[in-house]
Amino acid sequence: MVEAGTRDPLESALLDSRYLVQAKIASGGTSTVYRGLDVRLDRPVALKVMDSRYAGDEQFLTRFRLEARAVARLNNRALVAVYDQGKDGRHPFLVMELIEGGTLRELLIERGPMPPHAVVAVLRPVLGGLAAAHRAGLVHRDVKPENILISDDGDVKLADFGLVRAVAAASITSTGVILGTAAYLSPEQVRDGNADPRSDVYSVGVLVYELLTGHTPFTGDSALSIAYQRLDADVPRASAVIDGVPPQFDELVACATARNPADRYADAIAMGADLEAIAEELALPEFRVPAPRNSAQHRSAALYRSRITQQGQLGAKPVHHPTRQLTRQPGDCSEPASGSEPEHEPITGQFAGIAIEEFIWARQHARRMVLVWVSVVLAITGLVASAAWTIGSNLSGLL
């Protein structure tokens, strides 16, 4: 995903009259992720806003809703929670748990290859989350470092379940296009687009190889050439690249990435059991996975805080920035027929009739005033208590 460099036109918009778009985190080919706020519950959220070209695609929207509901029913701490889904104007969106931290990709860029005990610390929650999904009949289809999030508290969570399937269902998606990320696709996904739990297992096997060596097993001039190499070649042993990799990890990768799905672990449950046996055999220590320091999420949070601070220092209500620009004169458009509805509902920048940036300013101002009055009350209470204690002591002396 590509990090934002300039202010995004959706920032400060209120999606579905509920979700405030605060700051862009990153964007990719089909969507953009923002940090946001559920103004109804006053809860931070992550907003994945799909590209506007999907807004009128009923096949995509139907699959998008189904996948969101299926993932929302899963209750596993290793999966990024899905709170809501909807469409506002030309923007289908997904509301998810906001993970304050970064991605496994960013951690690999910062620190490079991992030792075996750190690899196990990453894989345990990833396989645990996948196991919960596989039990429910769900397949991820795009397991990769970009979809594995690490919180500042050390939690590892898997994100983006079902999005590949939703995009595949879109009528605008060309037939025969390989969906997913080439470096992590299983041979059957490349060959005919089919996927089952063993396809996720293959992707995890590639991930293990990358965590141990610092790079994926296949390289090429294009995504297509990288994808097709796995049809005729096995994933090499990590120990041939990095000295000291235990043979048990070579065996784990080999079993997970067998070209024939029948020769792989049946699902994440089976692979997770083998991982635990290896960790016990090697007596690997526990490890807390660190979040990347210089992540897109951290930069987005810092940017948003700086904007709020600057607005507060100005001592005036912030000016509302509209998310749309008038591109034609009012007379250029004929009046809509009676009873007709617009093709798309507009994205509103207001909450309860108030410009959303003014709403934020007022909410923060109210909080500051509450803190001031609480301080005053506490100070008066302290003085009264002190006086009462002094008077009581003097009376005791007199008596």
Swiss-Prot record:
Transmembrane parts of this sequence: 369-389
Active site, renumbered: D142 (proton acceptor)
EC number: 2.7.11.1
Membrane topology listed for this record: Single-pass membrane protein
Binding site for ATP: I25, A26, S27, G28, G29, T30, S31, T32, V33, K48
Major subcellular site: membrane
Top class in the EC scheme: transferase
Signal peptide: none
Residue ranges that the UniProt entry lists as topological domain Cytoplasmic: 1-368
GO BP annotation list: negative regulation of fatty acid biosynthetic process
GO molecular function: ATP binding; protein kinase activity; protein serine kinase activity; protein serine/threonine kinase activity
Subcellular compartments: Cell membrane
Catalytic activity annotation: L-seryl-[protein] + ATP = O-phospho-L-seryl-[protein] + ADP + H(+); L-threonyl-[protein] + ATP = O-phospho-L-threonyl-[protein] + ADP + H(+)
GO CC term, one of those recorded: plasma membrane
Residue ranges that the UniProt entry lists as topological domain Extracellular: 390-399
Stretches assigned to the Protein kinase domain: 19-278
Pfam family, one: Pkinase
Modified residues (Phosphothreonine): T32, T62, T173, T175, T323
Post-translational modification, as annotated: Autophosphorylated. Thr-173 is required for autophosphorylation and transphosphorylation activities. Thr-175 is not necessary for autophosphorylation activity, but is required for full kinase activity.
InterPro entries in alphabetical order: Kinase-like_dom_sf, Prot_kinase_dom, Ser/Thr_kinase_AS
Region described as Disordered: spans on this chain: 312-346
Keywords on record: ATP-binding, Cell membrane, Kinase, Membrane, Nucleotide-binding, Phosphoprotein, Serine/threonine-protein kinase, Transferase, Transmembrane, Transmembrane helix
Entry similarity comment: Belongs to the protein kinase superfamily. Ser/Thr protein kinase family.
Function: Phosphorylates the DNA-binding protein Rv2175c. May be involved in the regulation of cell division and cell envelope biosynthesis.
Protein name: Serine/threonine-protein kinase PknL
Gene responsible for this protein: pknL
